[in-house]
């Protein structure tokens, strides 16, 4: 409330001095008590407030029965005068991924409520934030159209975003300290890692700061890891950050990616690969291209180092492993490659001899200029029916008995069945839904009979 509210009432008095006692009533007197604080909580000094004050206010503001995970209270004075009070929930709002989500930040002007339905008060990727913005400089009769173009509000928004990012970074840094701080940060990442990734795609101006916050799974460590942690573990001669995408809940997620044949060569060389198992990773990560980190130099000045991001499920990624082409092996495998190409026809973009496979007979990769099959399927599911079919590149292991055995087979139907199974199993192991599962079963049954 902007103004104090008082309640006036009559209080009876008794001759023994005790209210409500069995003594003789001797009269009454009028009393007046303040029933509110008189000052909006976000306008009060932080030194006057306790955690419980913030927690109770958050529950009233958000209708959340849980206390917030974190709160940030700021008072700015100078060229602009405003107060902000932001809360990070312990759990993601139920409408977080709805197009028609309800904004969580309310706008006040001079402690007078203006709106709680303006999605421009915060960037879309920070839609999980709850709280208050109270400006002293905006007019009270401000309209939605004016809000969208107002430089004062834009400055408050930009400053607030940087403040939130700074708080998130402090939470991340504190996670290496106490168990409580670690649990707090892990809760934050479990709930809001995906919106942060959206920020990488949507908020170019803050991309470097967001890159320090996003977390991924890894083939080298348990739990979450960051780009900074990855480069700290890199081999001295390693030039790239390797990652694999294409999981997602529909495709089997992290478990599917960890079992991918595409990782065999990296495991053999003990090279860490980041596991990016969220559907959004396929969209966001390729736009980053690289990770840049500032490090203190010998002269005290900061130095910048950049590492290129490389997807292991792209054609040509095996060349980065230092595996040299074996011309003799390619010459020997050429008749087999031609048989597979002829059998598969336009189901694939290309068939190649793989340098990355150790144990598996085949794998699929995407052309560098094509989206992944998983991304194409996701876009189609979202209604982009004009999305053309993406044809995979099939890589085969020339040393595997199934592939090598094709050299001595002349039966075209049998070659077609084996080639079809090599492709279908490569799709399945990546968690990709087959267009013709019945055809796969028929081919497999024919091979089992023979």
Predicted regions and their residues:
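Conserved GHKL (Bergerat-fold) ATPase module
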Residues: 1-450
């Amino acid at each position: 409330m902007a103004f104090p509210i008082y309640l006036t009432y009559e209080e009876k008095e008794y001759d023994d001095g005790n209210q409500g006692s069995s003594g003789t009533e001797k009269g009454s007197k009028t009393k007046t008590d303040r029933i509110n604080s008189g000052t909006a909580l976000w306008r009060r000094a932080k030194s006057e407030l306790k955690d419980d004050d913030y927690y109770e206010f958050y529950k009233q503001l958000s209708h959340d029965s849980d206390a917030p995970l974190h709160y940030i209270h700021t008072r700015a004075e100078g060229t602009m005068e405003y107060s902000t009070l932001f809360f990070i929930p312990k759990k993601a709002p139920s409408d977080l991924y709805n197009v028609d989500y309800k904004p969580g930040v309310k706008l006040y002007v001079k402690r007078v409520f203006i709106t709680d339905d303006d999605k421009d008060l915060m960037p879309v990727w920070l839609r999980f934030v709850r709280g208050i913005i109270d400006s002293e400089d905006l007019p009270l009769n401000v309209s939605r159209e004016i809000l969208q173009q107002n430089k004062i509000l834009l400055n408050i928004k930009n400053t607030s975003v940087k403040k939130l990012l700074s708080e998130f970074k402090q939470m991340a840094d504190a996670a290496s300290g106490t168990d409580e701080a670690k649990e707090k940060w892990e809760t934050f990442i479990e709930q809001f890692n995906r919106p942060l990734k959206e920020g990488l795609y949507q908020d170019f101006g803050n991309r470097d700061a967001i890159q320090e916050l996003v977390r991924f799974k890894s083939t080298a460590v348990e739990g979450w890891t960051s780009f900074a942690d990855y480069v700290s573990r890199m081999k001295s001669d390693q030039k790239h950050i390797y990652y694999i995408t294409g999981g997602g809940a529909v495709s089997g997620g992290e478990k599917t990616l960890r079992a991918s044949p595409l990782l065999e060569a990296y495991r053999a060389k003990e090279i860490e690969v980041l596991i990016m198992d969220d559907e959004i990773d396929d969209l966001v990560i390729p736009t980053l291209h690289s990770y840049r980190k500032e490090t203190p130099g010998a002269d005290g000045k900061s130095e910048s180092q950049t590492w290129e991001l490389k997807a292991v499920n792209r054609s040509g990624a095996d060349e980065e492993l230092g595996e040299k082409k074996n011309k003799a092996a390619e010459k020997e495998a050429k008749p087999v490659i031609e048989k597979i190409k002829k059998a598969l026809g336009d189901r694939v973009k290309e068939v190649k001899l793989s340098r990355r496979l150790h144990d598996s007979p085949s794998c699929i990769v995407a052309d560098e200029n094509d989206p992944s099959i998983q991304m194409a399927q996701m876009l189609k599911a979202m209604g982009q029916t004009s999305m053309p079919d993406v044809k995979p590149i099939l890589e085969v292991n020339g040393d595997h008995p199934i592939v090598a055995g094709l050299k001595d087979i002349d039966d075209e139907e049998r070659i077609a069945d084996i080639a079809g199974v090599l492709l279908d199993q490569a799709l399945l192991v990546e968690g990709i839904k087959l267009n013709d599962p019945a055809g796969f079963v028929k081919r497999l049954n024919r091979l089992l009979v023979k």
